[in-house]
Amino acid sequence: SGGPGTGKNHLAAAIGNHLLSGGHSVLVVTIPDLMLRVRECYDGGQSEASLLDDLCKVDLLVLDEVGIQRGSSGEKVILNQVIDRRLSSMRPVGVLTNLNHDELLGALGARVIDRLQMDGGMWVNFDWGSYRKNVSHLRIVK
């Protein structure tokens, strides 16, 4: 958890790249993109069950931008299903969010937060300022 630009995605990418180099599968998906994929299921694309199976097959799933939409009930159900299935299968899931613990608890519910803390799951605070202003390729050249 942490504000924008604090390195949450950077750390998740480093972990993912390390796993990929060892032959593991990794999927990083934003919640808005995931919910778009779920809506596409209703329009006759992939079945929702098949989508959930795909999300549960990868060795590491990272859910990004959790809580950015302040969770509809449908979003809560999907996230609950994904997290529940992955943890029941002993497969890790990373959650990246700008929300603090209490805000995420409100967005996802106590059941999901409790499950995420099972088997050594931990909350990591990125409690420093944004680093983006220091990144040269993002600066405007005049």
Describe the predicted segments one by one:
Residues 20-57:
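Short glycine-rich substrate-engagement loop in P-loop NTPases that contacts/grips substrate
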Residues 11-15, 46:
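Generic detector of contiguous secondary-structure segments
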Residues 1-12:
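Walker A/P-loop nucleotide-binding motif
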Residues 60:
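Walker B motif beta-strand of ABC-family P-loop ATPases
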